[in-house]
C-alpha cells in the first residue's frame, strides 16, 4: 500500500492533482476542499488510499489522517465506493461531516449533491457509533479555542459564544470556505450575532 507521497504539485485537474515525486508523476484524486488548500509548484505531503480492483487502480489523497479516516469509514458503508466517498467529502468537509454525525444532523449530509435521504440515513446508521467517540463537536471546536477566548475577553458570555460557533460551523457558507478563511468568517459572524 502507498501510505504517503512527498512531492511537488505540477498540475491541478477538476478532481485530481498531479504530483511529481521524482522520477514518477502520480495522479491523485482529491476532494474539492483538499484541492483548494493546495497550490501549484508547492512541495506537499499527501496521505493516500490505494484503491485496487481487477479493472480499477486509483490513488486517493488527503491532507491529514482525519480526512482519510472519514473516507475509509464512508467506503465501509454498503453502496458507497471510493468515488462516492470522495464526492461526499467534496460536498461537506470531513470535520463538518463528523460534527453532523455527532449532532445527528442527517439533513446536512443529505444536502450533498447525489446523496438523498436514504443514503444519508444509511451513512448515519453505519457511522454514528464509529465516529462519535466522545463529543466530536468539542474536538472540532478546539481548532478555534483561541478565537473563542478572544471573543470572551471582549466581554461576551462563553456559553453564547460556543452556541454561535456551533451554529455558524454548520452553515453552508462556513463549510465551503478554505481553512485559512474560516477563522475570520467565524469571528465576524459571531460578533454580528452577539452584538444584536
UniProtKB/Swiss-Prot annotation:
Location of the region described as Flexible linker in the Swiss-Prot/TrEMBL record: 143
Chain segments carrying region Domain III: 143-196
Q: State where the protein is found.
A: Cytoplasm
Region spans: Domain I: 1-63
Residues covered by region (Domain II): 64-142
Q: What does this protein do?
A: The RuvA-RuvB-RuvC complex processes Holliday junction (HJ) DNA during genetic recombination and DNA repair, while the RuvA-RuvB complex plays an important role in the rescue of blocked DNA replication forks via replication fork reversal (RFR). RuvA specifically binds to HJ cruciform DNA, conferring on it an open structure. The RuvB hexamer acts as an ATP-dependent pump, pulling dsDNA into and through the RuvAB complex. HJ branch migration allows RuvC to scan DNA until it finds its consensus sequence, where it cleaves and resolves the cruciform DNA.
Q: What is known of its domains?
A: Has three domains with a flexible linker between the domains II and III and assumes an 'L' shape. Domain III is highly mobile and contacts RuvB.
Query: What's this protein's name?
Result: Holliday junction branch migration complex subunit RuvA
Q: What is the organism field in this record?
A: Borrelia duttonii (strain Ly)
